[in-house]
Amino acid sequence: MKTVRVPIALVQSVMRTLREKLQQANKYLNTDYPEPTLQYNQRGTIAGSAYYANWEIRLNPTLLIENKQNFIEEVIPHELAHLLVSRHFGRVAPHGKEWKWMMETVLQVSAKRTHHFDISNVTAKTFSYACRCQEIHQLTLRRHNKVQRGETQYRCRHCQAILQLIKE
């Protein structure tokens, strides 16, 4: 997997927003939560993820570079809110009322659960398979390789036929 280098100016913008939002939360909540670790190694179509045990946020470098300010304004507060909610409330629903409150009241950001960034550059290659009902099924590289090695078979949900690779 090719490593994507995030420009230093973008890293600085991410850090600035993270610190501003964390300071805002600490002031509102009368707490002193530490700055979380940031990693730029999130893969696939996920923009970011929060790891409570490590107090860490992982960001998708490709989506960050492609969406810059929109990414920073949406994803950084979103993932920070997950960490803050886990510390402040304990184990609760990931996008429940506590998270929504943290986003809208404490961080003063719109509580959106999903991003709407263009994912064409981070979408994995898929392979076309067919069944008896002529539906085309797209299998990921991992699933395709398992079929090719004879480790597994996949069936159509409708006709229950074993999927067959369409030779291109």
Curated annotation (Swiss-Prot):
Residues covered by the SprT-like domain: 20-166
Q: Which family does it belong to?
A: Belongs to the SprT family.
What are the positions of the active site?
A: E79
> Which organism's genome codes for this protein?
Proteus mirabilis (strain HI4320)
Q: Any idea what this protein is called?
A: Protein SprT
Q: Which residues bind Zn(2+)?
A: H78, H82
Instruction: Return the cofactor note field.
Output: Binds 1 zinc ion.
One GO cellular component, as annotated: cytoplasm
Cite the GO molecular-function annotations of the record: zinc ion binding
Q: Which HAMAP family match?
A: SprT (MF_00746)
Q: Name one Pfam family in it.
A: SprT-like
Main location group: cytoplasm
Lineage, top-rank taxon, reads Bacteria
Q: Which InterPro entries match?
A: SprT-like_domain, Uncharacterised_SprT
Q: Might you name a Gene Ontology BP term for this protein?
A: response to stress
Keywords, A to Z, come to:
Cytoplasm, Metal-binding, Zinc
Its taxonomic path starts at: Bacteria, Pseudomonadati, Pseudomonadota, Gammaproteobacteria, Enterobacterales
Q: Which cofactor does it need?
A: Zn(2+)
Location in or out of the cell: Cytoplasm
